[in-house]
Amino acid sequence: VEKKIFVAIGAAIAIAVAILGLLPNTPTPAPQVTQNEKLGIIVNTPSRAVTLEQLKDAYAEASTRGAGRNNLYLFWDHIEPQQDQYNWRDTDILMSLNKNNNLKVTLYFSIINGRIVGPYPEWMGLPGFGTSLEQKTVKTIDAIISRYGIIDSVIIGGQLDSYFDDEEGSVGLYKEFFQNVYTELKQKHPDIKIGNAFSLNNVLNKNLEHYVMEFSELGDFVVFTYLPVDRIN
């Protein structure tokens, strides 16, 4: 009797499998991915080696994987090669990709980039921290923010730890410069967050925490980048 029961069960399973095999294939719905503004992609000013299709694919893949932000680096000599004459071509393309993929934008318009300042456009020469540079900085960043509606944060100083490690005497000058630029931009764009960036690995490896403390109360935020392998120089 027991043998017949098992045979019957086996036949029922076989029939069920056969019926399932005859049913049309129903595609499994793709899982919904929620974009996270804290997860971003980094895009430097495009070189000629990068095609528009490659950029489109990179942005699309990033957004479908959950990225909700683009950290966009713009260099002053590229965006304003002539005074008051802006080169929007590349930036318009990148910003359209951000809009199409629902990405917020953090603008890296760094007056300081690690151990160097600038690069500035040739027409500016090499200005020091002061009123003239403050006015030009506010004017150019204002033009960029006003052109696009998706920039919600701006970084003015990048890897300050590296710069001040070489130019310790410039800390006070830059702090005054940053505060004046911050105040002017906040009057024009009160919802924009403005801050500075430090290299976490450099701060920890070289005991430069005091520079972070100098800027902890300035601006809206302090952000850290991290490269786990220390560079030789």
How would you name each of these model-derived features?
Residues 1-14:
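N-terminal Sec-pathway targeting helices
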Residues 14-23:
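Hydrophobic alpha-helical membrane-insertion segments, chiefly the h-region
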Residues 33-35, 63-64, 100, 146-149, ...:
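Extracellular/periplasmic catalytic domains that process cell-envelope and extracellular macromolecules
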Residues 44-46, 75-79, 159, 227-229:
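Short strand-loop junctions, especially beta-strand C-caps/beta-turns
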Residues 53, 88-90, 117-219, 225-233:
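Active-site cleft segment of glycoside hydrolase catalytic domains centered on the general acid/base Glu
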Residues 56-64, 71-119, 170-195:
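Aromatic-lined substrate-binding rim segments of carbohydrate-active enzymes
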